[in-house]
Amino acid sequence: MSIEVKMPALSPTMTEGTLAKWLVKEGDAVKAGDILAEIETDKAIMEFETVDAGIIAKILVPEGSENIAVGQVIAVMAEAGEDVSQVAASASSQISEPSEKADVAQKETADSETISIDASLDKAISNAGYGNKTENMTASYQEKAGRIKASPLAKRLAKKNHVDLKQVNGSGPHGRIIKADIEAFIAEANQASSNPSVSTPEASGKITHDTPHNSIKLSNMRRVIARRLTESKQNIPHIYLTVDVQMDALLKLRSELNESLAVQNIKISVNDMLIKAQALALKATPNVNVAFDGDQMLQFSQADISVAVSVEGGLITPILKQADTKSLSALSVEMKELIARAREGRLQPQEYQGGTSSISNMGMFGIKQFNAVINPPQASILAIGSGERRPWVIDDAITIATVATITGSFDHRVIDGADAAAFMSAFKHLVEKPLGILAQ
């Protein structure tokens, strides 16, 4: 009996992905544990292993295909003793026949069984003057063989929000409607409802601009970054606290540590020490090591620090788990491994999903100070500015010191200003008296 190879769920939250590359071809024999393909999620490219043995009879989804729903059949394998060509032919016919039936069914029921538009949504679109645009969208789809192409996730979201798929312009392959299209349509309608007399072309993702330009399609990662940061700024009331921290003692200790660790080929970075200081400060102020969760607050018993790492096409935050318990040398080695895998796109979901707080360091770019956006569902993030030589008062005397400006962003729903201040004070003390970092 033939074996269906389905799009895997490579993380608990994955609903769709991109089939980045096939590592096998039709006719190849495979065994359990062999890698079939590379799947791109919103944060990484991951290898997909088969759990069955057989021969690849037919590849149904070509590499490079985007927005492939979890559970969709992407290939068919023939078991030992089966006629490979017969399995391939059967797979091909099964693809075309349901498609033809769906076309006929769609044509017969298009007028009588379309998803109704919620009255308020319809009114919002009408008030904002989107009537002509909607008619054009509907006409364009009616001209296309009478069938609307949409992903299963998009269909569920449309049904839940009473959106007529005929009014949505698909941005997926061959005009296929994907989840992002439904979300954009709903956002546009909501914007129209709140500003009925104002034309907002930006809401639809179509900006009119006379300046010569290139249109660059957003990657999966960039779309997720855009969505999550928008959610953060819209839903989380940020409070910002800033401190100036003298770095000289920490820099001196780092130099001494690296001299002694050189024989082990370990080099501790300033960021490694700041991560450890952040973790210890979180343990010292448990009211900050928390997360907002609807009608409850989660208080964490360990400090898992998400570290912002710049990668091609965006940003990812690998996690140093239990950073408060790790030695500086162990923390440094693990961090370098995580950064390397992050830039190769080889992180596993459990290595970047979660965390109790984040840190973002832009000091190496000469940035003096910035406010970082909280990474939900976390409730805090540290923004590290560059260390620079500044006048500094010590014992009523002015001297020159290396000083960095560091800003903490906190979720004011669960973190009070006084608790945030206590955390920043604890962090500052650990950096300026860095032996405390080694002692814990």
UniProtKB/Swiss-Prot annotation:
Domain Peripheral subunit-binding (PSBD), residue spans: 149-186
Active site annotation, chain numbering: 412
Keywords: Acyltransferase, Lipoyl, Transferase
A single MF term (Gene Ontology): dihydrolipoyllysine-residue acetyltransferase activity
InterPro entries documented for this protein: 2-oxoA_DH_lipoyl-BS, 2-oxoacid_DH_actylTfrase, Biotin_lipoyl, CAT-like_dom_sf, E2/Pdx1, E3-bd_dom_sf, LAT1, PSBD
Subunit and partners: Forms a 24-polypeptide structural core with octahedral symmetry.
Protein name per Swiss-Prot or TrEMBL: Dihydrolipoyllysine-residue acetyltransferase component of pyruvate dehydrogenase complex
Chain's gene name: pdhC
